[in-house]
């Protein structure tokens, strides 16, 4: 699975091959949203799993205010 992290510094791509690496990313980004880029669907951090067969995830910085 490719994980794309979008933030103030631009974007960073990380290849995630196992659940341990995915869990690290989830822990670091637990206050953010994931988007499944294939579908544009927004998912909560705790719903993301390698078992879903997702090809690419984008991590989006949370919007402040509203």
Question: Which residues are covered by each model-predicted region?
Answer:
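Ubiquitin-like/PB1-type beta-grasp interaction modules and other compact soluble beta-rich domains
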Residues: 1-64
């Amino acid at each position: 699975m490719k994980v794309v992290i979008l933030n103030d510094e631009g974007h960073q791509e990380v290849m995630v091959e196992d659940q341990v690496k995915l869990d690290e990313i989830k822990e670091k980004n637990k206050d953010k949203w994931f988007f499944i880029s294939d579908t544009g669907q927004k998912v909560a951090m705790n719903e993301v799993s390698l078992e879903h067969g997702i090809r690419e995830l984008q991590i989006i910085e949370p919007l402040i205010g509203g």
